[in-house]
A protein has these predicted regions:
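Histidine-centered active-site microenvironments of extracellular/periplasmic hydrolases
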Residues: 212-253, 302
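His/Asp/Glu-rich, glycine-adjacent segments
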Residues: 8, 12-13, 17-23, 28-156, ...
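Terminal interaction module
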Residues: 57, 110, 197, 201, ...
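A long, amphipathic alpha-helix that forms part
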Residues: 165-206
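Hydrophobic/aromatic residues located in beta-strands of well-ordered beta-sheets
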Residues: 109, 206-208
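DG-centered beta-turn motif at the end of beta-strands
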Residues: 1, 42, 209-212
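Active-site neighborhoods of enzymes that stabilize oxyanions during catalysis
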Residues: 243-302
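Short gly/pro-enriched beta-turn/loop segments at secondary-structure junctions
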Residues: 153, 199-203, 249-253
Length: 302
């Protein structure tokens, strides 16, 4: 639910409710603006440069391969936990500081997540210290959240992640009627259940945020480095792993990360910049780091 959707649905009763009783702020997403980076940050309290989890796919030195961190698997598969026999999760994921800090203050943290992936190997490390609760539907989650708040005798922190708007954006696009229908349904449910969730005299601070926004990507105009004839020969710049296998590009459609031979960085940048002029920026990772794109601190994990 990025800013474009706020502008589109700002007259919805639930958005109007939030505006009347709270504040609506426009936030800048971290870079890269992707689920893996932001879900990790909100659960650990660590920015991208410290957590090391910066994209859906990236090279992980512990396994010498490109992985899908949220799945705890090698890239190129939708199967979960293909890395389980290869490496321990704690060696891949960061230990968070957020939930331990809450518990020291006497606040018990809970995390509500879709049953398809709650709990998960990723969550066992990144969300360590929080009690996980799974749900099938949003209405179920909201009712269970309300019951939890009603029964709690001590301060609690609850995090509820709803992924269906994002999922339909990926499948149909952000302007598709299917996506808009899902957003409308979400806002109707929130308005219907809001008072029921937060009834009573307990003091509750409510925050709704998006991990990132959504932008259109047209497959028909996408440039594929491994297919387009203008990029023939580019493979000579690609770095290989310890077994001599080329490291496939990581990242996603709008922020592609290339793993290149150290001695070919300048040549590769010139090669790509010339062919992508006016279509994409080609920059070295060290420039992004120096400009603070990944946060003020860079850890060895990154």
């Amino acid at each position: 639910f990025g800013w474009r959707f706020y502008e589109r649905f700002q007259d919805a009763p639930f958005i109007q409710r939030v505006a009347r009783h709270g504040r609506i702020e426009k936030l800048t997403s971290q870079f890269p603006s992707t689920t893996a980076a932001h879900v990790t940050t909100i659960h650990t309290g660590l920015p991208v440069g410290v957590s090391g989890v910066h994209e859906w796919y990236y090279y992980e030195p512990q396994v010498d391969a490109v992985i899908a961190p949220l799945l705890f698997s090698y890239s190129g598969t939708r199967e979960r936990d293909t890395l389980k026999s290869i490496v321990k999760p704690a060696a891949v994921y960061p230990q968070g500081v957020f939930y331990p800090a809450l518990k020291k203050l006497g606040v018990k943290p809970y995390v509500f997540g879709i049953r398809d992936y709650t709990p998960s190997t990723y969550a066992s490390v990144v969300m360590q210290g929080a009690e996980q609760k799974s749900f099938k539907t949003l209405s179920e989650a909201l009712i269970n959240l309300g019951i939890l708040l009603e029964r709690s005798k001590k301060p609690v922190y609850t995090h509820l992640y709803f992924d269906k708007i994002d999922a339909l954006c990926h499948e149909y696009g952000p302007t598709a009627p299917q996506t808009e229908a899902e957003i409308e349904t979400f806002l109707l449910l929130m308005e219907h259940y809001f008072d029921r969730i937060f009834k009573g005299r307990k003091r509750v601070l409510f925050l709704m945020t998006a991990d990132h926004g959504a932008s259109e990507v047209n497959p028909e105009t996408t440039i594929y480095l491994n297919i387009h004839p203008h990029f023939a020969g580019f493979e000579r710049f690609i770095r290989a792993n310890r077994n001599g296998q080329p490291l496939v590009p990581a990242g996603s459609a709008r922020d592609l990360f290339l793993y290149l031979r150290e001695d070919s960085l300048d040549d590769a940048q010139a090669f790509l910049s010339k062919r992508l002029e006016g279509k994409a920026d080609v920059v070295k990772a060290e420039y992004l780091i120096s400009e603070g794109y990944f946060g003020p601190e860079i850890s060895p994990r990154f």
